[in-house]
Design a protein with these regions (language model features):
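Aromatic- and glycine-rich beta-strand/loop motifs that create alpha-glucan
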Residues: 1-25, 170, 253-256, 270
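Terminal transmembrane helical anchor/hairpin motif
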Residues: 34-53, 176-257
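Membrane-helix interface segments
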Residues: 16-18, 96-98, 102, 139, ...
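Pore- or pathway-lining transmembrane helices of multi-pass membrane proteins that form conduits
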Residues: 20-26, 169-187
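Hydrophobic alpha-helical transmembrane segments of integral membrane proteins
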Residues: 97-121, 184-211, 260, 264-269
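Transmembrane alpha-helical segments in integral membrane proteins
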Residues: 68-82, 87, 158-173, 231-246
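Helix-loop-helix units of permease transmembrane domains in multi-pass membrane transporters
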Residues: 77-109
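Secretory targeting signals
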Residues: 26-69, 102-167
Length: 270
């Protein structure tokens, strides 16, 4: 498994999709500052300090950018094996197709946390350059823990979408659209029970993120329900991957290749 993860990170160096992810994870902090600057006085945050900047960045990331970016890169990692016609070569190694998928998904999980740290760093830089006040050790630690934790939980929330859309070649972009709608819809869920169960928002509840500023509600989500929701997402992903088989086209190509070899080796009759 470690070998698969290491290989995936080596492959990522050659993929332009990683650059798309870095650009995408730069935008939440910039969007937070820009929104605060152009908004009317009635809707602006009165004391927009570093604490508010981190909260706004995390909210924008979890509901808009992370679901799309994680699904895009996660699906791309596996889709490339189909489009580059390399899957048939990989499957000759004594590694099952399901184990290969688990390795790729785990590599993307690690990458999602790294993206969270990258977004945290960008938020600090944007805040300092914008002259925002209120930077302290408590704010730094809280922002880091929440950013990393919510990155991981947001990835878990979209894992079933990734796992389902990689079952067949060429449909992972449909998963990107579904993930966007999945994250964007979270903004309109007000009921505390639904917020606790909705996978995108479950991670916010577990990390004790205050959604009051963004959802106009002071009620905290139910931690037990949120943990249950996250567990269901993991179990659902495991089930989908275990039920996923290699595309039949791979076996057909391998079979045809063996047949061609036998034909070429067959001696000519007199």
């Amino acid at each position: 498994m470690l070998g698969i993860i290491k290989t995936e990170f080596l492959k990522l160096k050659r993929f332009h999709v990683l650059l798309i992810g870095l650009i995408g994870m730069t935008l939440p902090a910039i969007l937070s500052v820009f929104t605060q600057a152009v908004a009317t006085p009635e809707v602006t945050t009165q004391n927009f300090d570093f604490f508010a900047l981190f909260n706004s960045t995390i909210w924008n990331s979890a509901t808009i950018f992370m679901p799309v970016i994680f699904t895009l890169i996660g699906g791309y990692l596996i889709s490339r094996e189909y489009t580059d016609n390399t899957l048939k070569n990989i499957l000759t190694v004594p590694v099952s197709f399901q184990r290969l998928l688990f390795g790729k998904l785990l590599a993307m999980g690690i990458l999602s946390v790294l993206f969270g740290f990258y977004s945290y760093t960008i938020t600090l830089i944007v805040g300092v350059l914008s002259g925002i006040s209120g930077l302290s050790a408590v704010v730094l630690c809280t922002g880091l823990l929440q950013m990393l934790g919510i990155s991981a939980f947001t990835y878990i929330a979209v894992l079933p979408i990734i796992a389902f859309t990689i079952r067949k070649p060429g449909i992972f972009m449909g998963g990107v659209i579904v993930s966007f709608l999945f994250g964007y819809s979270a903004m309109f869920i007000k009921d505390v029970t639904m917020r606790s169960l909705y996978p995108i928002l479950s991670g916010l509840t577990v990390m004790r993120f205050d959604t009051g500023t963004f959802m106009n509600t002071s009620e905290h989500g139910n931690l037990t329900l949120s943990m249950l929701s996250i567990t269901v997402m993991l179990l659902l992903t495991i089930t989908i991957v275990r039920l996923t088989n290699p595309p039949q086209a791979v076996f057909k190509r391998k079979k045809h290749k063996k047949t061609d070899i036998l034909i070429r080796k067959r001696p000519k009759g007199r």
